[in-house]
Swiss-Prot record:
Name of the protein this chain belongs to: N-acetylmuramic acid 6-phosphate etherase
Catalytic activity, reaction form: N-acetyl-D-muramate 6-phosphate + H2O = N-acetyl-D-glucosamine 6-phosphate + (R)-lactate
Gene giving rise to this polypeptide: murQ
Additional free-text comment from the UniProt record: A lyase-type mechanism (elimination/hydration) is suggested for the cleavage of the lactyl ether bond of MurNAc 6-phosphate, with the formation of an alpha,beta-unsaturated aldehyde intermediate with (E)-stereochemistry, followed by the syn addition of water to give product.
Entry superkingdom: Bacteria
Record-stated family: Belongs to the GCKR-like family. MurNAc-6-P etherase subfamily.
Catalytic residues (UniProt): E83, E114
Organism: Salmonella choleraesuis (strain SC-B67)
Amino acid sequence: MNLGTLVSETRNPQTMDLDALPTPELVKRFNEQDTRVAEAVKATLPDVARAVDAAAAALKSGGRIIYMGAGTSGRLGVLDASECPPTFGVPHGLVVGLIAGGPGALLKAVEGAEDSQQAGEDDLVALNLQEQDLVVGLAASGRTPYVIGGLRYARQSGCTTVAVSCNPDSPIAREANIAISPVVGPEALTGSTRLKSGTAQKMVLNMISTGAMVKFGKVYQNLMVDMKATNVKLVDRACRMVVEATGIGREEAEALLKQTDFEVKPAILMALTGLDAAAAREKLAAHQGFLRAALEH
């Protein structure tokens, strides 16, 4: 493949003079380019919705969401995966981020790590990949061998696969059941796909993980009711969520949370139904953790 023909590698005619610009104009040019990212992502929303449903289906069937990528793309996957346990109360390992070259590549580039299809397969083998898992391959260029190898192995293993790329009709898209391709155009700094391409990928990942967790019962209204209250800020947030969801006073909310070890969902259910903590947990379990269903039935 001639990489120079990729949209993400071509020069942007609107930023040819970056090195001659005064600082206010320099940052204005970057900002002007960034405004195009949301529109590019908007054009992919039908495919993002399919990915959300596939991710939720994977979780409900006992599978995992596995992101894999190299460089910036890999780091974004690891970032999104690492935020899921504290935000949604899920166990570590339910959402996984793989980066070419291993964890050390998060801080320092591992030269050549992305160029091996076998490495992508090997990393999934090491995770004991199961057909219930969803594998999401991330590559701004759409042609990273590490990601191609991983997606190909995942597909052969019976997994649903998703490709996220910022070039149209990319090689990784052809390896996936669902292709998401926000074409953001040439970068302000030629080929620096940590810019618009990285922003677009982050926006897509935000929707995939958050949307899947909504459909997995981890959200009530727009509240992260399975959040782990692990510090003073989050204990305060837990209290505010109970107050906002129920209309009770703060002192009563704090008292309920102490009975639930600061778990928000049973505290809300207790406030709205009069159940005790054990009965609230039992009712939530009977409705697979969906608070709305527990309240309505």
